[in-house]
Amino acid sequence: MHLDVWGARGSHPASGMAFSRFGHHTACLSVRSGDHLLVLDAGTGATALARALEPNPPRVVEILLSHFHHDHVMGLPYLLMSLPAETELRIHASPEGALGLETLVAAILSPPYFPAGIAGVLGRTDCRQHAAGAAFEAGALDIRTHPLEHPGGSTAFRVSDGARSFVYATDLEEPEQPDPAWIAFARGADLLVHDTMFTEAEREVRRGWGHATIEGALQLADAADVARLVGFHHNPVHDDQVMFQREQELARRRPGSGLAREGEALRI
């Protein structure tokens, strides 16, 4: 099993050559399992995924949305409209608030947020809303969920093929005290993809924004005995020079760890 990185930025895309080594697009990852494609978030990176799928589209696409902030759903219409009509489409999420999943997806695919013309896509999309902490299957993959501390809520996913597993945990503010349930959720994962958006100094002035630091990611990885840690949801103002410095610090403290790069495949 390997995890393809189509976008690793947070909040908004980065622009310019100074950001090219770690990438410009916002959150989108994917993993193939037989004739299923599992997509984790659909930020602007989903547009790159859509282009890559054109020669060999999967029979089933299942999309896990951590939450509905723009940087995680901006590419959703482009991905959905790029797929053949015979592709089975499923979207899984645990949105907070009164609006249900189907209502939120319909809004993203409709005016005034998106031009008319893809209403048929919604009609063939199976929107599956799950309670926080739910477990379900996506083809041969087992999915577990865990609620995260983030404005408006967010969801972490643990994905397993029966032999290997990874945890995708973005848009969370690390707890002040160790959370046994959160540690248990990540326990023994082969790969932890974790929000590392803020430096410690940035976090001090942005408490409550719902993002984590390298320190917070390291604490979870160590407490949960995770095999490998990869930082994600990169600050869009952190250029390659800053990113290399942060990655070196992460690798120094936990050898084998790194920061996600757009276009790479993470072996699990």
Predicted regions and their residues:
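Binuclear metal-dependent hydrolase catalytic cores
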Residues: 1-167, 182-183, 241-268
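DG-centered beta-turn motif at the end of beta-strands
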Residues: 169-171
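Cap/insert and terminal regions of metallo-dependent hydrolase folds
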Residues: 173-263
